[in-house]
Design a protein with these regions (language model features):
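Hydrophobic (often cysteine-bearing) scaffold residues that line and stabilize catalytic clefts
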Residues: 45, 59, 152
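Acidic (E/D-rich), amphipathic helical modules within compact regulatory domains
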Residues: 78-85
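Amphipathic, Lys/Arg- and hydrophobic-enriched alpha-helical face
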Residues: 44-54
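Short, functionally critical alpha-helical segments immediately adjacent to catalytic or ligand/cofactor-binding
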Residues: 57-74, 86-97, 156-158, 178-183
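Hydrophobic side chains within well-formed alpha-helices
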Residues: 45, 62-63, 215
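Non-catalytic cell-wall polysaccharide-engagement segments
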Residues: 1-26, 37-40, 54, 96-234
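A short, structure-level motif marking secondary-structure boundaries and short turns
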Residues: 33-35, 47-48
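N-terminal low-complexity, intrinsically disordered targeting/assembly segments enriched
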Residues: 34-37, 60
Length: 234
């Protein structure tokens, strides 16, 4: 038995292809490019994914899919929302995940996780739930997220687990809801995404940003990243 709620993943969960830049994911060249992308992510980051995937009980297929979708496997610089790195995490998300972990997750952060986070961002030792991080602390976190790939993957994977536990209903950790919330924000989505919807239902939900609905297809559609992972035994 694992520590956390078990995740149920059906791949593909929807019989649609993701469309981006006029290319369908049924396009042979796009499929080859995405298989190559996943292989490169495994080659470059499997050690970190294995370590933190095991810690937070998230399969490498899911972590790789998020990295591929969020950053294309590149250590991306901060965007206008201050999201950065392989898993496009923001400083505020780091702070919130650490200080509010116990509000949603029954299993406390392990000593291993706390020690690693404290080493990566020393200011985390002084985090508290009542005081958001200052500009100086945000910059410290931003630097760690941008320059430390293991920290980015570790905290990104922790965020996935936090969301899985926060959004579970009737003991089910719904990966669809997690994907939408990771992309558009937990607090923005928690009232718009209730019960345990299928990917198809979420894609057709006009209350969810178009980008987030495309995000779902990119991960869970036919020839999406999770589908390609399992088809090619990565």
């Amino acid at each position: 038995m694992g520590k956390y709620t078990k995740i149920s993943i059906k791949v593909p969960d929807v019989n649609r292809s993701f469309v981006s830049n006029n290319y369908k994911y049924s396009n042979t060249n796009v499929i080859k490019e995405n298989i190559s992308l996943l292989n490169n992510i495994v080659k470059n980051y499997s050690k970190f994914m294995n370590t933190w995937g095991e810690e937070f009980e998230i399969d490498n297929s899911v972590i790789s899919g998020f990295i591929a979708t969020e950053s294309g496997g590149k250590n991306a610089p901060p965007n206008k929302f201050k999201a950065t790195g392989l898993m496009q995490v923001t400083p505020d998300t780091v702070w919130e995940t650490i200080v509010k972990w116990d509000n949603f997750v029954e299993v406390p952060l392990s000593d291993k996780s706390i020690k690693f986070f404290n080493k990566s961002i020393p200011s985390s030792k002084k985090f508290n739930s009542k005081t958001p991080p200052s500009s100086a602390v945000r910059n410290e976190i931003l630097g760690a997220l941008e320059n430390n790939s293991e920290f980015n993957i570790a905290i990104g994977t922790a965020v996935l687990r936090w969301l899985l536990e926060a959004l579970k209903e009737n003991g089910i950790a719904n990966i669809n809801k997690v994907m939408v919330s990771y992309n558009a924000g937990y607090y923005a989505m928690r009232k718009k995404v209730t019960n345990n919807p299928t990917t198809e239902q979420l894609i057709d939900n006009k209350n969810i940003p178009k980008e987030s609905r495309g995000y779902l297809l990119k991960m869970l559609g036919v020839n999406g990243f999770l589908d390609l992972w399992f088809k090619n035994n990565l």
